[in-house]
Amino acid sequence: MEIIQKIIKERTFIDPKDGKTKSRFGYRGHNQIAWIIVHYTGDYGSQGCAKKTADAMQTWKRTVSTHYLVGDDAIYQTVKDKHAAWHCPYEKSNKCAASNCVAIGVDLVERKRNPRSHSVKDRDWYFTDKVIQDGAQLVAMLADKYNIPQDHIVRHYDVTGKWCPRPFVGNDTNEITGDIHEIGWAMFKERVRLARRCPDDV
């Protein structure tokens, strides 16, 4: 599996809104990686292109980042595993113990049929088969590398209740795939399990 390294070089930036120094990622300290949290970018303009978001992360003045971006074009790593990306803050982690300091963030880069509407409730956010397949392979590889149990592979939604990744959240039907969103997540998790070294032991 080829992963393009596009590591964010400048950790800190000056927030133009308040003039304060802030960071794009942080340090884990003594915390061990124990979770993988799956997201989508929520950027209707990405249309499956991981490079666009990976490039933007290099300079944007936002306290938001992720370790990996999986797109139709390629897989990018933007934050080293040993560092904490800002993708799921602890103060919002009210459903399980996963958070930035103990998790790896994986963003699947979505497409949207109608980019004029940006609502998370829209049912036309979707992942291509390639993104799902490559994403499952990446998550399986990371889970095996860090000995992460299958039930510690979760959605952003499972941690905070935020509808992310939308193509895998909700009991409504996706307009593109025809699948119920929750079933899409179950199918993705099964792909991950089958791609692991010992699928029957996780």
Q: What is each PLM-predicted segment?
A:
Residues 43, 102-104, 108-114:
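Short connector loops/turns at beta-strand edges and beta->alpha or beta->beta junctions
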Residues 38, 104, 153-155:
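Hydrophobic faces of well-ordered beta-strands that scaffold small-molecule active sites
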Residues 1-99:
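N-terminal catalytic cores of peptidoglycan-degrading enzymes
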Residues 1-14, 30, 97, 109-202:
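Basic/polar, cationic surfaces and motifs that engage anionic cell-wall
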